[in-house]
């Protein structure tokens, strides 16, 4: 909560509609950054405060805005963001002048950050899904010694990227590059168009990485764009295998299938990764590798998958196979995760209802 009446007044003022005639008032009040007014907005889900300016039009969290203000040694904004609720400890991540460090400590920051606090800061800043936030986090943190030397963070990022590193070895790249790839992947996961373009333009040699993340994170729009824009060294069956490692990746599985990927291999991969939803989609798309899939399910004693594979009354879904499109708009409308229900899953569930008398 704001600690002074003045800070509260500024907070109320920053939430109001901004007109050009009011710019001089906002500038005098300190609600001015990078030659533009500061406004306050809130995230839809958890109502976090977002700071917006012309430079950060999609919004920054208070803590990320504070880190940027500290980097710029903007003492007025450091005090304002702290009064609005930012954690002054975050400022120690980007502090570069003794006078600014003194101000941070005066406002309550410790002299140094512990390894656990550094990890906490990383977890805190990464989850707000705006292009401005992702881009600035990359710029402030990817080459930051505090994060490059954090052993726990290295393990976390290594684990996040390990499954996706199908065409390179993580041991052969720097941690700075790992962090860059991580922020790039977050932009694709959250479907942040401006952030994706930012990374694409600056890291053109990561074109395969963009495609990999598009497949893995079910972003069929970005997958389609990059697949048709760039030559890739990744085989279509490799793409399908990656798509099948994450359940409910319906749009990218369908896209790879339409490009000619082996749907039986996709079925087997789905079983290997315990992806029930993907398994049913593969059956809808004509997969019939039941013997191989049953052998894998039996080895792991996965009775849910075993029972699904024992059922005999499956057939391809002609409504999916007849369309034959790689248009992401059409694919998304056809296989929207919240609306799509597999024809063969419905048949299987109906059979269970007849056996047990309850909906599964």
Swiss-Prot record:
UniProtKB keywords: Early protein
GO aspect biological process, one term: taxis
Keyword field contains Repressor: no
Upregulation: Expressed in the early phase of the viral replicative cycle.
Top-level taxon: Viruses
Disruption phenotype: No effect on virulence.
InterPro entries assigned to the protein according to its UniProt record, in alphabetical order: ASFV_MGF360 (IPR002595)
Family named by the database record: Belongs to the asfivirus MGF 360 family.
Function: Plays a role in virus cell tropism, and may be required for efficient virus replication in macrophages.
The name this protein goes by in its record: Protein MGF 360-1L
Lineage: Viruses, Varidnaviria, Bamfordvirae, Nucleocytoviricota, Pokkesviricetes
